[in-house]
Amino acid sequence: MVSKKSRTVVREQKHRRLRNRFSGTAERPRLAVFRSNNHMYAQIIDDTVGKTLVSASTLDKEVKAELEKTNNVEAAAAVGTVVAKRALEKGIKTVVYDRGGFIYAGKIKALAEAAREAGLEF
């Protein structure tokens, strides 16, 4: 009997494969996105030194104050806007988008488009 892998296991395998293909540098850091059932998280990471330069999530007071729910497309867009604004304040203009093995649709796409509209290039 062949058992089917869970969605989480498949997503983690995809993410590992993607991470082998690219990494963030000081000139072009990585915008890593994680989606849980209740929240969205985004970090801009310099992989050469292993440090998070900028982060934002639906748990931040700045983001949470303007949201009714934290697990919808509007919340993801708000996180994208905030992470882009914080990155531009630190002088980060271009990033590599790491969708974390998630399908590029819905909340993942909304976060990316909001970050682009706010001024990040990827």
UniProtKB/Swiss-Prot annotation:
InterPro entries in UniProt: Ribosomal_uL18_bac-type, Ribosomal_uL18_bac/euk
Keywords: Ribonucleoprotein, Ribosomal protein, RNA-binding, rRNA-binding
One biological process term in Gene Ontology: translation
Highest taxon of the lineage: Bacteria
Any one GO CC term of the record: cytosolic large ribosomal subunit
Signal sequence annotation: none
CDD domains reported in the protein's UniProt record: Ribosomal_L18_L5e (cd00432)
GO MF: 5S rRNA binding; structural constituent of ribosome
NCBIfam families: L18_bact (TIGR00060)
Similarity remark: Belongs to the universal ribosomal protein uL18 family.
HAMAP family cross-referenced by the UniProt entry: Ribosomal_uL18_B (MF_01337_B)
Main function: This is one of the proteins that bind and probably mediate the attachment of the 5S RNA into the large ribosomal subunit, where it forms part of the central protuberance.
Assembly and interaction partners: Part of the 50S ribosomal subunit; part of the 5S rRNA/L5/L18/L25 subcomplex. Contacts the 5S and 23S rRNAs.
Name this protein carries in UniProt: Large ribosomal subunit protein uL18
Species assigned in the record: Lachnospira eligens (strain ATCC 27750 / DSM 3376 / VPI C15-48 / C15-B4) (Eubacterium eligens)
